[in-house]
Amino acid sequence: MQGRKIAAFSAMLACAALLLGGCGAEKAVDKTDKSVKPVIVVGSDNYPPYNYEDVDGRPTGIDVDLATEAFARMGYKAVFSVIDWEAKKELVESGEIDCIWGSFSIDGREDQYRWSAPYMVSCQVVPVRSDSDIYTLADLAGRRVAVQTTTKPEDIFLSHDDPRIPAVGEIFSMQNRELMYPFLSKGYVDAVAAHETAILQCMADYGLEYRILDEPLLTVGLGVAFAKEDERGLEKALSAVFEEMREDGTMEQIIGQYLNEPRGYMGGGDR
């Protein structure tokens, strides 16, 4: 009799376990369906104030905040990957990253990627030391200029397509953009060319006193680049969300956390 009671009790426990296990599995599926968003991997190098790590090692910056908000509105979770900027095209085409979003200029690259609409306007400029005798782009003739590799300034100085830009003496193409500024400060180069907002950020962060030439190299739009073979339509959806974020004030609020007079940047930049 005692054996039957134990067997019956064991059977009841087994049934209860099955029922509880079934309920748990059902809840797990529910949770997955409702709360886990698909991931979008955003690729950029370190490029303050657009994309960099804060003191706790977390991604932050204009592009990080814009991407987080925009993709959330589209139903995605943005995850940020620090990439070798020279390898950006290969990375997005291979699918290792979903898009390139790092102060990236559309101008001259229209046919290389699927682009979102421009979300910001900015320009490439030339800073020199405060005691320099360079005051115009024409004064760069025969001088040494540092640029980051695979950027618009490198292309501008190497292509000789712009009649305003003279033949310089030497071009220093650097993979690590942060080396350009010590080279300028030490006098190893006479000028650098880069994104205006990045230069201003560097000057503020390190107390550098450079003089930026009045005449910009180029003013263009910044966009988000997807692979040409990517047929998900994310660039179109992102463009629509950008318009939404302009209209409801979110874009101005995010840019204003990093730059003064954010409305001046909300037109359509260059790198």
Descriptions of predicted regions:
Residues 24, 64-73, 131-134, 138-152, ...:
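Extended ligand-binding regions for polar small-molecule ligands
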Residues 64, 68, 77-139, 211-216:
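Acidic, polar ligand-binding/catalytic clefts
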Residues 29-103, 173, 248:
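Extracytoplasmic small-molecule ligand-binding "clamshell" domains
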Residues 53, 67-76, 153-175, 203-207:
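Ligand-binding cleft/hinge of the Venus flytrap
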